[in-house]
Amino acid sequence: QQLIQAGCKSVHIERFWRNWYSGKPLNRSKVRLPAAAEAILPQMEEYLANQLTAQEKAESETGTRWVLKASDGQLIECVLLPREGVCVSTQVGCAVGCVFCMTGKSGLIRQLTDLEVAGQVQYAMRNAPVKKVVLMGMGEPSHNLRSVFSAVEHIVRYSGIGYKEVVISTVGDKRLFKALMESQIKPALAISLHSAMDEKRRSLLPRAAELTVKEILEFGAKYAEVGKYPIQYQWTLINGVNDGVDEIEALASLWSRQAILNMI
């Protein structure tokens, strides 16, 4: 918005954000900015640099985990994945309270802005090649729809990553499902299922939206048809809880062809 107010045209704005994702300073010899934009550029670059700063880094065989500090001091996690992917957070904390997830122990602290979501992608791209973005870190994307959709649109438009390579991971929510169907951009979708039995699933995801497994899978099949891309279902195996034959039989009775089951 500041660039527009300073007289920038779409070509200036596009080059600015593309350079931001690449970590390169704007080449003023290639794109001549209006004088008003030139004047505010240093403060804009400083503002963006201060949105997220690295606090910790931990490397393992499964990826590189960064703890990033937001401008208000809150901490979030961002993980560089194998095969040029990055997992980003959408909230500080989470309200869902999945029994196997540590993030929900603290509850929801605050929403991330669209710039903070996109900024995690930018931070990863400055440090390694990134071709896929997974919104599967801290937080529940369906509880922060405005920032999530704005960030996804920004990432797709300026980072060079296609919308099919952006995955929104959710426990399932009618508001998100409606927004996805109405959106021109159709990102890939991953749904945290974890059980094919309604009562058991509610015990594992105690504060998830009131949707039956059947309703979730029916939407998944519909979205896969519209988006021309299979839905991913996530299943964290818990010994003696959701790893029995009864789960297999229940899931088989509801399963759609246009789906992938990822067991963790």
Can you name each region flagged by the protein language model?
Residues E77, E116, Q120, E140, ...:
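Acidic-residue sensor for enzyme active/binding pockets
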